[in-house]
Amino acid sequence: MYIERFPKIEDKIEAGKVLVIYGARQVGKSSLVKNYIEKLKLNRSNEKQAFFNGEDVNVQAIFSSMNLKTLNEAVGDVSLVIIDEAQVVRNIGISLKLLVDTKPELKIIVTGSSSFELSGQIGEPLVGRMNIINLFPLWEKEVKDASLYDYITDLDFALRFGRYPAVFKEPVVEKKKEIVTNIVNGYLLRDILAFDRLKNSKLILDILKLLAYQIGNEVSIHEIATKLSIN
């Protein structure tokens, strides 16, 4: 079951600009893009598409090259380019600028799990050349439109487990816990630790736990530092 997300890609995408989709891992970026492509197929659009995975070393070599000939050979005659996990590609901003400036008819979608890394790379080169979608876990309007929505039950689950799409769609509580644990350990902490080369994963986890206990209250940095014996 696909849950309709807002804003929609079709409302933000335009030729001659890069559509940047920011969002944490597992929040639904890939599903949003796939749903957009499915809509194009249903509407019998003749747009030719090229999909690139930024974690592929060959893709990294192409889009970090800043070489217009290399970029044009990779893109070919397509009208829609999609680059997933673009934050791991060095010089991605400059390469995208070259494509936008030389192919004004081209539509480009890039997704990034690390807003810090991706915005740092594309911010200056793509000024005036990009639109942005910030994708978060499911929010009230999106959930209310889903067929299995029950306000009281969902509120309880939302407060306990959050609203990552995979968690929301899983009916079994124990499996919800497992999915949340996997997201925290497999993705969230990995991305946090990768930012600015942080290494102390236990300390980060302890800070997150203390922040969770203070939800709804004013956060005291001094109190957190005292409890964890850090400065």
Predicted regions located by residue number:
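Short glycine-rich substrate-engagement loop in P-loop NTPases that contacts/grips substrate
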Residues: 48-80
